[in-house]
Structure formats: structure tokens, C-alpha cells
Amino acid sequence: MSILATVIRPNRRWIVASTILCLAPLAALGEDAGLPQLRQQGSATQLIVDGRPLVMLAGELHNSSSSSLDYMKPIWPKLASLNLNTVIASISWELVEPEEGKFDFSLVDGLIEGARRHDLKLVFIWFATWKNGDGAYVPAWVKTNWTRFPRCHHRPGVNTSQLTALSEENVKADAKAFAAVMRHIRQVDGKKHTVVMMQVENEAGIMPTARDHCPLAEEAFAKPVPREMMDYLIAHKDTLIPDTREIWGKSNFRESGTWSEVFADDADEVFSAYTIGRYIGRVAAAGKAEYPLPMYANAWLVQHKGQKAGQYPSGGPVAKMLDIWRAAAPSIDLLAPDIYLDDFKAICAEYTQSGNPLFIPEASRDEKAGLRAFYAIGRHHALGFAPFGIDSLAETDVLRGHYAVLGSLLPLIAQHQGKESLQGFMQYRDDKRVEFDIGDYHADIEYRSEDGGKPGGGLVIATAPDTFVMAGMNYSIRFAAGRDKPGNTAWLSIEEGAFRDGKWAPGRRLNGDEAWWRLNLGPQPRVLIGKVYRYP
């Protein structure tokens, strides 16, 4: 039986609907109000844990690190020393359910306990049907029974090791295991809230072809596009992202027909995105029925313009498939990019389209990682940021300093998320400067490196119309009179210092050469507070 036979209703505005899914089961489960949930503040979506916003200064472990509690023992203190507040760790179907119906949660329990001992929050990744476009983490009893658990075919008649997304048996087995995991997490963590989010599968999709060609897939592909899919597109036609409108527009926005008739030469990828999204959405929904933590799906990105589906995992939540995933998986609260590409700013912009909350669960762990965190959190008010392979970083890595500064600012950042009073910036390639209005003034920032060409970046928070918290490194800043507000400006006062437990602890009072015209933030991340005044 194909899973397309199962009908779902199309969702309304996506972020509203997904947030409701996070909140609705609370009363039924009897959980307290501190359970992790998503909440809207202005234009931003916040993760609320125990009634307070949590901005995740995170890191993702290497794939196999969390498969051994002994291996993790020396890693936990290192993670804490890097000033993380959240760790992203994988748990796999093959270790959780090594025999059908027999579950082993010892790793889950040990990871939760390790995080608690070091005052860290956890995001668990569910490695199951998909991990990087493959299925290596399904249990042996699934791998070896290809009759009961049918496989994806890259071409007709040729089996692969990857489970097909079109099989009811496949999705039921995955969803049952994930539901058991969520039930157990509720039992052991439903009051302490160490686990704050769940990633459902990992970089799902099909490679090296654009779609599945197994008998179930061929049958479904030849049929009309499911009515609920078309109803979603029709209902959201005016707010679809440009990529969706371009794809659908090739058929002059046909409202019915086969996949090829409606989506033309993009039909294979759209079909894959919808069927994989439906599958993962059902897995997530089964988990939320047990314990409704926020849940997301992550994407292996299109690597360059013109790259064809199948050269990256076809059907995954790449930016151009966001609307298709929203139609297919309303139980998924957000879609998240794994960013290893150079154009970090453009990718962040793509993944904030139509209200998608930005969370970056994987990113390069190079010397720019800290600046990327400043940018994502300051410019896009992201839920969090995580370099991959965090356990490979030395305790003296530069990220430690960036996370220390950001960590000290988190209460203030949370207060200003979703408002124009929080702005982030980051030097990209040959960028020389950036300007923006903030408070009652116009900020003029020049990037300047004092340590061999390293880039600059940071964030600015207007705590009052004339008072600014400035953080980051390798830039200088001045404030000019805002638009339609004539006059000259100067610094009234500048303090160097730090926030401790949300309160400002002043250090040096800067003046003279250090504060003339432009204020310089040098090669080490730091925090300054400046007050500006206007005169005729």
C-alpha cells in the first residue's frame, strides 16, 4: 500500500499551524507549561523552555560520538568549556530498536544525564530511514527483509539499500520506533526539559536519481497530483515563494493533472519532495502524539547553480522545495539548512522566506564560525547556530570567545528578537562597509582587520533610541543623524565591559583618541555600550 493513500488536510499559515501542533497536546499529556515550545515575538520565532527564551549557541557532534557513553565522557567538559549551551547529538534507530519491538534507551538516558551534569540542553537527531540521502542507520531486521520493507529503485527493477518513501510498512515501522523514543523522553525528561528539540531524519532525499522508480513510486507518479497538495498550492498561491511560482507557472498554474502535467520538468523532484516530506511528517506526528517537542527537518543544499536533483539528495527540503514540504509535512515546525557553502548570507535569506524560522544545525567549524553565529542571531534572529563536529575543536578555539560574548548577551538578544532594534552583520568577500537605521540614528560600519585579514562582524542592539550595545570584532562604527533628522552627532559616553547574569558590569570608560569619530572593535570579540547625542 502506498502512503499516498493516507489523506491529510492542508495547513493554514505554516508557522501558525506548526506552532499550534507543538502546543495542542500539552493538556492531554499533563505536562507543565515549561515544556519546550515555539512562540512568536514580533517578526521572530523563539524557542521557549521553562517559560524563558533559549537562543541555542550549539554544536553538533560527529555522527558516531554519541553512540558510546564512554567515548562521550571526556567530551562533555570540553563542550561546556567552549561556552555552548546546547549540544546536537544523534540517536539511531538501529541502536534504539536492535530487535523488532525490543527497545534499548540506555544511550538516550546516558546522553540526557551527561548534558544535565554539564548544564547543557540537547537536540536529538533521529537517524533512521534517511541519513545523508541513504539508510545506513535502519536496524538489521529491516535491512535484511527487503520483501517486507521495500526499497527505492534508482531505475526500474534495480533494488538499492535505501527504503522507499512510498511504503506504508516502512513509514509505520519508523514512526513506531520514533514514537517509542518520544514516549521515553517524556517519561525521563518531561519535567526537566533537557531535550528541547528533535531533528527528524537527516538530510533526506534520493541520490543519484531525481526520484524513486520502484513499483509503488511508478504507480503513484502516473496518478494525478494528490488533491490535498493542489488545494494547498491554490490556497497559498499569493504567498508562495518565487521558486514555487516559477515551477508551477510552467504549466500556467494547472489545478489538476499528473505530476508531469502540473510540474513539467521539475515533476521528479517535486514528487520526491512531497512523498519524502509526507513520510517524515508522519514520523514526526507519531512522535508529537507522545511528546510534542518542536521538530525540524534539515537539508543537504544545492551546491551550485544548475546542479540537478539527484546530484544533491532529491526531495530534501532544499530552498526551492520549501512550499512543497510545508504542504506535505505540517507536523514539521521548521526547515533548516546545513551550511557548508561560502554564501552564508544568501542561504540564511532563503531559509527565512515566508516566515520559516531560521535554525542552522550544521555549519563549517572554521575560524568564521563565530561571526556566522553573530550574523544569524543578529540579522535573522535565528533560533540557534551549530558548527558540525564540535567535539573536534580545541578548548582554546576562537569560537569559545565568540560564544562567551554572545552567551553574555542572550537575555538582551531575546528581549529584542523580532524587533528592528537588533541588527547583525558580517563581512563577506570584499565587503567594505554596511549601513542601517537603528534607534533614532543611522549606523555606519566599516570592516577593518588588525590581525592579518580576518573578517569582521557582530551585532548592535538599540536599548534606547540613543543607546547602543555593540559586540563583535574587526569593525569600526559611528552613528549619524537618522533620516529626516538633521543635525550633527557625537559620542556622549562609551563604556567597555561585560554582561554578567543579564546585568552590565562596566570596565574602562573610553574617550579621547579611542572614541574620536569612529569607535573601533579590534581583533578580539568584545562588548561596548555607547550613548550618542545630537547637536545643531
Label each region the model flagged.
Residues 2-18:
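Bacterial N-terminal signal peptides that target proteins for export
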Residues 31-84:
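N-terminal carbohydrate-binding accessory modules
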Residues 58-67, 90-106, 156-176, 260-277, ...:
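The substrate-binding groove and active-site-proximal loops of carbohydrate-active enzymes
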Residues 66-80, 313-328:
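Short, acidic/polar
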Residues 71-146, 277-290:
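Aromatic-lined substrate-binding rim segments of carbohydrate-active enzymes
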Residues 147-322:
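Polysaccharide-binding and catalytic clefts of secreted carbohydrate-active enzymes
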Residues 282-292, 320-413:
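Catalytic-core region of carbohydrate-active enzymes that cleave or remodel glycosidic bonds
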Residues 374-485, 497-502:
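Aromatic- and carboxylate-lined catalytic core of secreted/periplasmic carbohydrate-active enzymes
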